[in-house]
């Protein structure tokens, strides 16, 4: 319902702006409710706005030209996001500490992004600043939603990680490696990236493959880190289009705050796995300048005492605005 209401508002605003001046607005919701679980990475949401080249700051323009070989024909976007991720153990009805289970943790953040879109590749540089702990409002968010949908209230948030500020820098490159153009098109988009910070420090490799009648030059639907990045922009605005997609990502993880526990105080922790991988599949539909996408994700075990891989779904709505 929220996505439908947002789309109605944005359609009216978008119609009043010249096509060459509009940016891109996207909302992503990830939740394991669709997999009938309520544990580990249990919910995430992110709202992002990307503005086009003519509106980017002098700093973004200088960074692109200095470090990324940007010229006047390159498409550049500058973006800001706000988001929140929630993590819980398997049994949210137990108010006591649960050793060996995923610690309770909330993460609230702002993200600033620069996107450089060239013919052969897209580079994305992001900075996340935020907080882990009670100030991230994880307990309020989860239990407010659970009350709204008449679901079980989580009783163990008193055991969550303590407040800790977070800074994380990330760089990702996605290559437009290969496209087969016939009645139905197929393309392959390899990706590589690295993140450094006290939230996560990791390197990653992966790919996205898409199949459909008219594959635009975007990168697939947006996602929430550390998943496959996708794209926060829409390269075109067809009246109707669709494509199926699948993807895989492998990550080498040196640091994960929500598993390792607080850096400066005693807190719950588990022994993380240094190698994590995930697979995804979904469908995206373009209708009148909007892109609506549904993605199902399987993430491998992230810590030694985790019993099973984790499944969750992502829903995203993107529009030119």
Name each model feature, range by range.
Residues 24-33, 59-63, 185-196, 268, ...:
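Transmembrane beta-strand segments that form the barrel wall of outer-membrane beta-barrel proteins
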Residues 39-45, 76, 104-108, 123, ...:
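Residues that define the transmembrane beta-barrel architecture of outer-membrane proteins
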Residues 96-100, 153-159, 193, 266-269, ...:
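Extracellular loop and loop/strand-boundary signature of outer-membrane beta-barrel proteins
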Residues 45-51, 82, 110-116, 129-131, ...:
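Residues on the lipid-exposed face of transmembrane beta-strands in outer-membrane beta-barrel proteins
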Residues 66-140:
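Long, hydrophobic/aromatic-enriched structural stretches that serve as scaffold segments
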């Amino acid at each position: 319902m929220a996505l439908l209401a947002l789309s109605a508002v944005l359609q009216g605003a978008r119609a009043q702006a010249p096509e060459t001046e509009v940016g891109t607005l996207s909302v992503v919701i990830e939740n394991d409710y669709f997999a009938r679980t309520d544990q580990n990475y249990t919910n995430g949401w992110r709202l992002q706005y990307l503005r086009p080249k003519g509106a980017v700051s002098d700093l973004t323009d200088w960074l692109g030209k200095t470090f990324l070989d940007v010229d006047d024909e390159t498409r550049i976007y500058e973006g800001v996001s706000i988001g929140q991720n929630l993590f819980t153990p398997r049994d949210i009805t137990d108010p006591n500490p649960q050793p060996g289970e995923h610690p309770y943790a909330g993460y609230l953040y702002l993200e600033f992004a620069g996107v450089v879109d060239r013919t052969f590749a897209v580079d994305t540089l992001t900075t996340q600043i935020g907080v882990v702990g009670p100030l991230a409002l994880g307990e309020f968010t989860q239990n407010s939603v659970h009350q709204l949908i008449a679901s079980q209230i989580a009783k163990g948030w008193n055991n969550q990680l303590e407040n800790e500020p977070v800074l994380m820098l990330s760089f990702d490159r996605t290559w437009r490696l290969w496209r087969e153009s016939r009645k139905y098109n197929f393309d392959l988009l390899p990706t590589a990236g690295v993140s450094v910070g006290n939230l996560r420090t990791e390197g990653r490799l992966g790919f996205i493959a898409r199949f459909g009648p008219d594959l635009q030059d975007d990168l697939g639907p947006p996602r929430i880190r550390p998943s496959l990045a996708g794209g926060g922009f829409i390269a075109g605005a067809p009246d109707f289009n669709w494509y199926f997609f699948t993807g895989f990502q492998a990550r080498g993880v040196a640091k994960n705050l929500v598993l390792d526990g607080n850096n400066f105080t005693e807190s719950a922790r588990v022994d993380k796995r240094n190698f994590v991988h995930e697979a995804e599949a979904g469908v995206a539909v373009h209708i009148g300048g909007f892109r609506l996408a549904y993605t199902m994700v399987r993430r491998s075990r992230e810590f030694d005492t985790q019993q099973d891989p984790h499944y969750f779904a992502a829903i995203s709505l993107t529009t030119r605005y």
